[in-house]
Amino acid sequence: MAVTDKERKLAATLSDPVLWGQAYLYNRDGSGRDYWPHQVEDLRCPAKNIIHLDGRDVGKSIVLSTDALHYAFTTRGGQGLIAAPHQGHLDTIIEEIEFQLDSNPDLMNSIALTKYGKPKIHRKPYFRLEFTNGSVLYFRPAGAYGDAFRSLHVGRVWVDEGAWLTERAWKALRQCLKAGGTLRIYSTPNGLRDTTYYRLTSSEQFHVFRWPSWLNPLWTEDREAELLEFYGGRD
């Protein structure tokens, strides 16, 4: 049977996180989600290992949440971990993901149901989403030692504010990623050099993104001058 144009378009949308995000996700004002050029570059990057050195307000949380939702929505039986130094970092991402679920019935319908008909959105002891295709997204804070990571074995990991993970947490995190899995690390650098995060930013095994704050199309010269004065320069 010949593939219809509608089926061809759907296949293209599902295979591309940018097209998928534009089709399924929304901005807070209710308009359809769109992405800045630097966000598109990240979302379409095929590298297994990605690390960021980002400024403020460049939209990294939007990219992380888009990629995580796209992965879970389109990967049968996939398991992914969203990790961050502390629960407060995760709460921002969780809030964005819950907003998207509430905004699109098709997305909410992709969440599996309990035997009582309730969505499998678990909040205790840690936030977890289970999807009808068998995919699971885990959200875990690293804490000092990465104890919350130790029971997991996943195919994809997203790290928010990776510069602030402790060395022991990094070790625990690496052990929960399956061989051949994908690791995407997002962070604003903290200036510390004797760390796993800093070492990975110069590793040949990682594709490095550097996003200064002025990549944000809404950035202003006044805001740039303010931060340059505060930090003493661009470096």
Question: Predicted segment positions?
Answer:
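Phosphate/NTP-binding elements of NTP-utilizing enzymes
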Residues: 2-235
